[in-house]
From Swiss-Prot:
Name of the protein this chain belongs to: FMN-dependent NADH:quinone oxidoreductase
Organism, scientific name: Citrobacter koseri (strain ATCC BAA-895 / CDC 4225-83 / SGSC4696)
Residues binding FMN, per UniProt: S10, S16, Q17, S18, M96, Y97, N98, F99, S140, R141, G142, G143
Gene Ontology molecular function: any one: electron transfer activity
Keywords from the UniProt entry: Flavoprotein, FMN, NAD, Oxidoreductase
Entries under Pfam families matching the protein: Flavodoxin_2 (PF02525)
Lineage: superkingdom: Bacteria
Quaternary assembly: Homodimer.
Job description of the protein: Quinone reductase that provides resistance to thiol-specific stress caused by electrophilic quinones.
EC number(s) given by UniProt: 1.6.5.-, 1.7.1.17
Annotated family: Belongs to the azoreductase type 1 family.
UniProt catalytic activity: 2 a quinone + NADH + H(+) = 2 a 1,4-benzosemiquinone + NAD(+); N,N-dimethyl-1,4-phenylenediamine + anthranilate + 2 NAD(+) = 2-(4-dimethylaminophenyl)diazenylbenzoate + 2 NADH + 2 H(+)
Length: 201
């Protein structure tokens, strides 16, 4: 039995294209893998705190006493990392906002990227500690950006996920959503077909 973690990050709730694709992914996965467990974390509906000068001190190894706010941030970071490590398939709904991922998703990454916990530095360079996992990125965009300099999402996510140890990464794109109903419908249809292939693999 596999465990699937779905991370939503769109601020558009039910109107979100990436949210609809992640819901479709969950439906298809449950149909094809009924014994698997699925956890959905909505980072927009339940946002994690923004990393600031106070909170960053809680995530670095130190013997200094922590403030109550730092204690809460450290406990949440531990919870998020334990959840991430406990799942086999990580599905990230990553819509494009101004050429990059939503703030809500970046805030999550800032809480799970911890030296000595999800990665470590060695004589040969950094080593990811979140291993044996597969990631699926569902990325909706208003325009057409795939394989162009304006797509900052795919390179960033490959680097970040690889840095913490997740190197098996598949991307599903829904592009041209803002180009009109016909283009948007085709984008959704093509993305769902790609999801079907990922789920069946």
């Amino acid at each position: 039995m596999s465990k699937v973690l779905v991370l939503k990050s769109s601020i558009l709730a039910g109107y979100s294209q990436s949210g609809q694709l992640s819901d479709y992914f969950v439906e298809q996965w449950r149909e094809k893998h009924p014994a698997d467990a699925i956890t959905v974390r909505d980072l927009a509906a339940n946002p994690v705190p923004v990393l600031d000068g106070e909170l960053v001190g809680a995530l670095r190894p130190s013997d200094a006493p922590l403030t109550p706010r730092q204690q809460d941030a450290l406990a949440l970071s531990d919870e998020l990392i334990a959840e991430l490590q406990a799942h086999d398939v990580i599905v990230i709904a990553a819509p494009m906002y101004n050429f990059n991922i939503p703030t809500q998703l970046k805030n999550y990454f800032d809480l799970v990227a911890r030296a000595g916990v999800t990665f470590r530095y060695t004589e040969k360079g950094p080593e990811g500690l979140v291993t044996g996992k597969r990631a699926v990125i569902l990325s909706s965009r208003g325009g057409i950006h795939k394989d162009t300099p304006t797509d900052l999402i795919a390179p960033y996510l490959k680097v970040f996920l690889g840095f913490i140890g997740i190197t098996d990464v598949n991307f599903v794109f829904a592009e041209g959503i803002a180009y009109g109903p016909e283009v948007a419908a085709k984008a959704q249809s093509d993305a769902k077909a790609a999801i079907d292939s990922v789920v069946a693999a």
